[in-house]
Each structure stands twice: as C-alpha cells, then as structure tokens.
From Swiss-Prot:
The keyword Isomerase does not apply. Its main location: secreted. This is Conotoxin Cal6.17. Keywords: Disulfide bond, Knottin, Neurotoxin, Secreted, Signal, Toxin. Transmembrane segments: none annotated. Probable neurotoxin. The cysteine framework is VI/VII (C-C-CC-C-C). The lineage of its organism: Eukaryota, Metazoa, Spiralia, Lophotrochozoa, Mollusca. GO terms for molecular function: toxin activity.
Amino acid sequence: MSGTGVLLLTLLLLVTMATSDDACSLLNGDDCGPGELCCTPSGDHQGTCETSCW
C-alpha cells in the first residue's frame, strides 16, 4: 500500500513540474532558484516560486 502511495505522489510531482516551470512543493523542500521563495496557499504544500510572498 505504501509503495502505491509513493508512486502516485511521484507521478503527481512529475506532472506538476512538467505543467508549470515555476511550481514548487514544500514536500521536496525549496525547489526554487536563488532569491526565490516557495509561496503556497494556506493549507497547501504545492505553490509557485516568487521573489516575495504576500
């Protein structure tokens, strides 16, 4: 069961990364470039790379 969950999570992350260049995930740590922050909506681990979060 846990192997299936890991596989699904990996596929989800790959799809997210492929569809948006500025996407980041707090599950992976900070995927953003130098000087960028991973800005996420409250309660979500997926977000976008921004120079500042509002």
